[in-house]
């Protein structure tokens, strides 16, 4: 009997990379594998994508794990380096790094390195989180071009704040700032992540950085799914029924008795709970698949168990398979029901959930 297990479909992952190449045919791909590849497994994901042009991570530790695991492709530190003492390692491992503040620039100017570092200057075009402000950008860029520790030419990167809102006007403003600054500069350019790839073809430039869409999940909050863009879900969160019980009309279920059956029925108990990372906020009615059939969660999600209403005529039995999201049940639907973003759902699964990779 299988308890909580994430099944990762390598074939779907490779399909998605190819699909994104079709959407951005003139651009190279930075496959973003930060946060344990969005919960899909850092090394296994990178090894499944030998055709990716580079990989993107948020921490130096993630980059070092890739190198230790045999990944030789370029690795981009999307947030840059946090300590000047990391620069020799970045240089020796040939990592690319974002540079977005004065402290990082000064560290590069003062460092003693055997080889120069490939730099992506981060321009704040409107996200207002990381990056050099436009009015300071030319001077900052000039210093990078004069720095002996920076491999030339300097590349330029930015990030959209509202790419998933095509009618708000913010993305056009960011693109205008980005284009103005990049004009006449020889380096590579990148601004499009998942939303930009899907909705803003004029933003694709030299490199795109697919994140959540690489894993078959839509970055948009408009009830779309990855399938709407030709992508396939890579992760399926699965488990099993550990009990099937007769349940009488009028009886409550679970902590607090928040759900009361209106009929005699059969209840299934699933080996899954918030201790595995499934959202405790999932209300009664949230769908799961039992033997490929959609049934509703009833009562509160507990630490280790979820109850589902199988229906009065159900023939399901203990040990039968359950899918909480994934193939046949998009995680975007669970996000909509629980008001927990799909990004959070797939990245917060706990260490007791087993990982299984299939082709």
From Swiss-Prot:
Disulphide bridges in this chain?
A: none
Sites bearing N6-carboxylysine, chain numbering: 122
Q: What cofactor does this protein call for?
A: pyridoxal 5'-phosphate
Q: Name one GO biological process term.
A: peptidoglycan biosynthetic process
Q: Which residues form the active site?
A: 34, 255
Q: Which positions bind substrate?
A: 129, 303
- Which key words are in the record? Cell shape, Cell wall biogenesis/degradation, Isomerase, Peptidoglycan synthesis, Pyridoxal phosphate
Catalytic activity of the protein: L-alanine = D-alanine
Pathway terms, separated by semicolons: Amino-acid biosynthesis; D-alanine biosynthesis; D-alanine from L-alanine: step 1/1; Cell wall biogenesis; peptidoglycan biosynthesis
The family note in this entry says:
Belongs to the alanine racemase family.
What does this chain do? Catalyzes the interconversion of L-alanine and D-alanine. Provides the D-alanine required for cell wall biosynthesis.
> What binding partners and quaternary form does the record give?
Homodimer.
In its UniProt entry, what is this protein called?
Answer: Alanine racemase, biosynthetic
| Gene that produces this protein | alr
């Amino acid at each position: 009997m299988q308890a909580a297990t994430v099944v990762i479909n390598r074939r779907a992952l490779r399909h998605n990379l190819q699909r994104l190449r079709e959407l951005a045919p003139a651009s190279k791909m930075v496959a973003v594998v930060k946060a344990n590849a969005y919960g899909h497994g850092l090394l296994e994901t990178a090894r499944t994508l030998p055709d990716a042009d580079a990989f993107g991570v948020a921490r130096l530790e993630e980059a070092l794990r890739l190198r230790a695991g045999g990944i030789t492709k370029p690795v981009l530190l999307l947030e840059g380096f946090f300590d000047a003492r990391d620069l020799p390692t970045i240089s020796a491992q040939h990592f690319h790094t974002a540079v977005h503040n004065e402290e990082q620039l000064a560290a590069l100017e003062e460092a003693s390195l055997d080889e120069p570092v490939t730099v992506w200057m981060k321009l704040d075009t409107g996200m207002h989180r990381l990056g050099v402000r436009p009015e300071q950008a030319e001077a900052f860029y000039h210093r990078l071009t004069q720095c002996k520790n920076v491999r030339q030419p300097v590349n330029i990167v930015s990030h959209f704040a509202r790419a998933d809102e095509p009618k708000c006007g913010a993305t056009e403003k960011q693109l205008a700032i980005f284009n103005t600054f990049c004009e006449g500069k020889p380096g590579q350019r990148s601004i499009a992540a998942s939303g930009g790839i899907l909705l803003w073809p004029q933003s694709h430039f030299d490199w795109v950085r697919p994140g959540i869409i690489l894993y078959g999940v839509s970055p948009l909050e408009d009830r779309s799914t990855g399938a709407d863009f030709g992508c396939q879900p890579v992760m399926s969160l699965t488990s099993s029924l550990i009990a099937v019980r007769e349940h009488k009309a009028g009886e409550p279920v679970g902590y607090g008795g928040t759900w009361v059956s209106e009929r005699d029925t059969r209840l299934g108990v699933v080996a899954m709970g918030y201790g595995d990372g499934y959202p405790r906020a999932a209300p009664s009615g949230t769908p799961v698949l039992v033997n490929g059939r959609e049934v509703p969660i009833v009562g509160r999600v507990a630490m280790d168990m979820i109850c589902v209403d199988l229906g009065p005529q159900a023939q399901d039995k203990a040990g039968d398979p359950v899918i909480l999201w994934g193939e046949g049940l998009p995680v975007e639907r669970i996000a909509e029901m629980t008001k927990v973003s799909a990004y959070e759902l797939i990245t917060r699964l706990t260490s007791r959930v087993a990982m299984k990779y299939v082709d």
